[in-house]
């Protein structure tokens, strides 16, 4: 009878650990994305205007493609 209890407690601890780990990881990722949002076209356009460049759609698309290619290699 005690072996069954050990197995049940081990399974319960495993399930609780997985659930707790999921929620901790989810909270961490949400706070990380809130602090460091991914760059979109509007942010890139604003950045180029602040640097004194005229942001054409061709330049925006080129830079977005370059950033996506760079992030895909990592």
Curated annotation (Swiss-Prot):
Annotated keywords: Membrane, Transmembrane, Transmembrane helix
Name of this chain's protein: UPF0154 protein OB1676
Cellular compartment(s): Membrane
Transmembrane segments: 4-24
Domain of life where this protein originates: Bacteria
Record's bilayer topology term: Single-pass membrane protein
Gene Ontology cellular component terms for the protein in this record: plasma membrane
Lineage per the UniProt record: Bacteria, Bacillati, Bacillota, Bacilli, Bacillales
Family note: Belongs to the UPF0154 family.
HAMAP family: UPF0154
InterPro entries in the cross-refs: UPF0154
Pfam family, any one: UPF0154
């Amino acid at each position: 009878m005690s072996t069954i209890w050990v197995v049940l407690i081990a399974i319960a601890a495993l399930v609780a650990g997985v659930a707790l780990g999921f929620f901790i990881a989810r909270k961490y990722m949400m706070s990380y994305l809130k602090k460091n949002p991914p760059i979109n076209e509007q942010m890139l356009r604003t950045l180029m205007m602040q640097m004194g460049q005229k942001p054409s759609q061709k330049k925006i698309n080129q830079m977005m493609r370059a950033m996506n290619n760079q992030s895909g290699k990592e």
